Amino acid sequence: MPITCGDIPRLICSVIIPPVGVFFQVGCTKDLAINCLLTVLGYIPGVIHAVYILIKE
């Protein structure tokens, strides 16, 4: 699925605060919990996971 103009704000949120971008994309799901854990363990893994979720959806 190509990235649209509506994805740009989510992508920016995902780079600044990864769980926020994931929450906007999928809501309160296991992906959000995984992203919160990855962000706490290391910022870069959280960003990578958030971008993956945005591109996957």
From Swiss-Prot:
UniProt entry keywords in alphabetical sequence: Membrane, Transmembrane, Transmembrane helix
Family: Belongs to the UPF0057 (PMP3) family.
Gene name tied to this protein: RIC1
Membrane-crossing residue ranges in chain numbering: 8-28, 34-54
Biological source species: Phytophthora infestans (Potato late blight agent)
The keyword Ribonucleoprotein is assigned to this record: no
Bilayer disposition of the protein: Multi-pass membrane protein
GO cellular component terms, A-Z: membrane
InterPro entries for this protein: PMP3
Location(s), subcellular: Membrane
Protein name as it appears in the record: Protein Ric1
Organism superkingdom: Eukaryota
